[in-house]
A protein has these predicted regions:
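Extracytoplasmic
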Residues: 35-37, 51-55, 91-93, 116-118, ...
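N-terminal Sec signal peptide cleavage junction
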Residues: 19-21
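Early exported N-terminus immediately downstream of N-terminal targeting peptides
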Residues: 39-76
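Bacterial N-terminal signal peptides that target proteins for export
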Residues: 1-9
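A short, solvent-exposed beta-strand micro-motif common in secreted/extracellular proteins
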Residues: 117-128
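Tryptophan-paired
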Residues: 73-114
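Glycine-rich, aromatic-bearing surface loops/beta-hairpins
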Residues: 23, 129-164
């Protein structure tokens, strides 16, 4: 087989194997990264969780399989199984637990997660009412403000230069 034929065969084989294999061969597979967040603010409204304290976990997920399991997990199940997951898979998660009372604000700086690498970040809030109460935070944003309201929460991207 000529060089040209061998090259054509190799190219066709690579294309048939799929993009994931090619990305792996050239070192372009996705990898865990450090959050780019300059800050993360947790803010409980006056009536947060129907005027009750609320548990909030910021979770850096360091294992792709664990991410698949947690992505659809409601907060109630997370809080019920968190300790077991941390015991069973200690290297797969870094959990930053907080508890806020209504009208409380906690501001976190990038020193908190400095040097940590993760596939994704999730926030779980332990509301008294039923619901998912989970959000995924993109690691490549400047930061977030998590606003805990009466029956649910929102996570808004922090715009560079904007006040927290």
């Amino acid at each position: 087989m000529s060089r040209r034929g061998l090259f054509a065969f190799a190219l066709a084989a690579a294309l048939l194997c799929g993009c994931g294999t090619m990305r792996s061969l050239v070192g372009m597979d996705p990898k865990p990264v450090s959050p780019d967040w300059k800050g993360l603010t947790l803010r409980a409204a006056d009536d947060a969780n129907s005027n009750s304290a609320i548990a909030v976990d910021v979770v850096l997920v360091k294992d792709a399989t664990m991410l698949d399991a947690l992505t659809n997990m409601p907060a109630a199940k997370w809080f019920a199984t968190r300790a077991e997951l941390q015991r069973t898979f200690p290297e797969a998660l870094t959990v930053y637990p907080y508890e806020l009372v209504p009208n409380q604000t906690i501001k976190l700086t990038d020193k908190k997660w400095n040097g940590q690498k993760a596939w994704a970040a999730l926030v779980f809030a332990g509301y008294a009412n039923a619901g998912e109460h989970r959000a995924r935070l993109l690691l490549n944003n400047a930061g977030y403000v998590v606003l805990l309201n009466a029956q649910g929460f929102s996570a808004s991207e922090l715009k560079p230069g904007a006040p927290q």
